[in-house]
From Swiss-Prot:
Membrane topology: Multi-pass membrane protein
Protein's recorded name: Na(+)/H(+) antiporter NhaB
GO molecular function: sodium:proton antiporter activity
Upper classification of the organism: Bacteria, Pseudomonadati, Pseudomonadota, Gammaproteobacteria, Pasteurellales
Organism (species): Pasteurella multocida (strain Pm70)
Keywords in alphabetical order: Antiport, Cell inner membrane, Cell membrane, Ion transport, Membrane, Sodium, Sodium transport, Transmembrane, Transmembrane helix, Transport
Keyword NAD: no
Cellular component GO terms, alphabetical: plasma membrane
InterPro entries: Na+/H+_antiporter_NhaB
Entry keyword Transmembrane: yes
Similarity remark: Belongs to the NhaB Na(+)/H(+) (TC 2.A.34) antiporter family.
This protein's encoding gene: nhaB
Subcellular location: Cell inner membrane
Function: Na(+)/H(+) antiporter that extrudes sodium in exchange for external protons.
Length: 513
């Protein structure tokens, strides 16, 4: 093997060769266009390239190719290190949220696992169970990180799939078997396929639930906190500002959940086979019998910490990330987790995305320095105030469906804040636009795994291939939710939001600026 071949193999690892070559071409072309053609065109090309790296997340995590593009952008002068640093400091609370809150919830997984297991085994109606999973995921995602909620539900699904697969293969609960191979299933194959379809539908309902709940509060999604910081909204005000849009969307989302299960469309409707339920119930009883006093006390402690988390966030007793740090300290102290290695595992989930977020901010700095979004913002602001809301929602929604919604929200809220400071829009209109940006980035982004981190997390999990959940199938199953959430969100932003906000101000729940 030559050094050239070795270099190509090392560069971006197992990514497709065409993708590696494409990234190298981008790195060659960008400086040429920046210096000899137009910095504006080079800036837009960088944004398009960065969106491509996000869309290719299944082939290669965007941190590496996106990071290389951002590094080059800083090196050739498209932005400056000081501006990147300023963007990071301005959004430091989001970084704290990702580092500490996600890690804190990791230590509450046992409680969440217990809750979802009980839901799965105690509710026999598939429609009620689907609504319960969707609502539970929505409620938890309003206070916790959506990735962690999905991770817990994946753990439940993975555990139950493994239990049934072992028994169907002729083994016992505790036997070590390869659950990726079906060669020993035999006559239970049809039951296994039905169980896979059942788990697929529950996973999708849960993921959509995280989007329904995540849009409602300032801690539900990372971009929410960015918007809340720019608009100077506390937890309660953010919730009330979003309510005219998020409440109708939540209701219609739950109705959609009920209808797709009732009529068995878009891949939904599969029920839990009775044989599988019997095996899972027996497995759960065995686990309950093995549970010690120490284990029960840990669940109780985690429940108390959960109450503290909700109270701390609701009354904004500290920065979100700091509350997450208190969760880590309390959960590890009272549950006996004292090993540095055990604590370190909690941070594995969030730190890659935290690093990627810093790369986002580098691209945002380029967008600001090169005035890339100025024509779009000017076009939107030239419209009437009533039309501006719909246009912001639509532009955010389209971009969020193919790109990461944190990136999209950061760009748009920064540009809108600049328009406010330049006197192009008034404060009340700015606040309505902030709601349109938040809902526009959160709701239509359920269309593809590229937009919602929780969807991407499920797609890249070890459970997805086991239950035959591919990219195409996920998009297809998300389609009814995409249509309903996007359309209801748009109608609410255009026709309900302005009037409802005025009513909330008049009755004293919101303060006029």
């Amino acid at each position: 093997m030559s050094y050239t071949q070795a270099f190509l193999r090392n560069f971006l690892g197992t990514s497709p060769n065409w993708y590696k070559i494409t990234i190298v071409l981008f790195l060659i072309i960008n400086p040429i266009i920046f210096f000899f053609i137009s910095p504006f065109i080079a800036g837009w090309l960088l944004v398009a390239e960065f969106i491509l790296t996000l869309a290719m997340a299944l082939k290669c995590y965007p941190l590496q190719p996106g990071g290389l593009l951002a590094l080059e952008a800083v090196a050739i002068g498209m932005t400056h290190p000081e501006h990147v640093k300023a963007e990071i400091i301005a959004n430091f609370e989001v970084i704290l949220l990702l580092i500490f809150m996600v890690a804190g919830i990791y230590f509450m997984k046992r409680l969440l696992l217990f809750v979802f297991t009980k839901l799965l085994l105690s509710i026999r109606s598939k429609m009620v169970l689907s609504l319960a999973f969707c609502l539970s995921a929505a409620f938890l995602s309003a206070f916790l990180d959506a990735l962690t909620v999905v991770a817990v539900i994946i753990s439940v699904g993975m555990g139950f799939y493994g239990v049934y697969h072992k028994v169907a293969s002729g083994n016992n609960f505790n036997d070590s078997t390869d659950i990726t191979k079906d060669d020993k299933i035999g006559e239970n194959k049809d039951t296994l396929e039905q169980f896979r379809a059942f788990l697929r539908s529950l996973m999708m309902h849960s993921c959509v639930g995280t989007a329904l709940g995540g849009v409602m509060t300032m801690v539900g999604e990372p971009q929410n906190l960015i918007i809340a910081e720019q608009a100077k909204w506390a937890f309660g005000e953010f919730f009330l500002r979003m309510l005219p849009v998020t409440l109708p969307v939540l209701i219609c989302g739950l109705v959609t959940c009920f209808l797709v299960e009732k009529f068995g469309v878009f891949g939904y409707g599969a029920k839990l086979p009775r044989k599988v339920w019997g095996i899972l119930a027996k497995f759960d009883r065995n686990n309950q019998q093995k549970m010690s006093q120490q284990d029960r006390l840990k669940l109780f402690v985690q429940a108390l910490i959960g109450i503290w988390l909700v109270v701390g966030l609701a009354f904004h007793l500290a920065a979100v990330g700091i509350i997450g740090l208190t969760v880590i300290i309390l959960a590890t102290s009272f549950c006996g987790v004292t090993s540095e290695h055990a604590i370190g595992k909690a941070f594995q989930e969030s730190l890659p995305f935290t690093a990627l977020l810093v790369v986002f901010f580098s691209v945002v700095a380029v967008i600001i320095d090169q005035h890339l979004f100025a024509p779009i913002i000017q076009f939107v602001l030239a419209a009437s105030e009533h039309t501006q809301l719909a246009l912001f929602y639509i532009f955010n929604g389209l971009l969020s469906a193919i790109s990461d919604n944190v990136f999209v929200a950061t760009v748009y809220i920064n540009e809108t804040k600049a328009a406010l400071e330049a006197g192009l829009i008034a404060q009340p209109q700015y606040e309505l636009l902030a709601v349109a940006i938040n809902t526009g980035t959160n709701l239509p982004s359920v269309a593809t795994p590229n937009g919602q981190a929780a969807f991407l997390f499920l797609l890249t999990s070890s459970l997805a291939p086991l239950i035959r959940l591919s990219y195409g199938r996920m998009v297809y199953m998300a389609l009814p939710y995409t249509i309903v959430l996007s359309c209801i969100g748009l109608l609410a932003v255009e026709y309900i939001l302005p009037g409802a906000t005025n009513v909330l101000i008049q009755i004293g729940l919101l303060k006029p600026m």
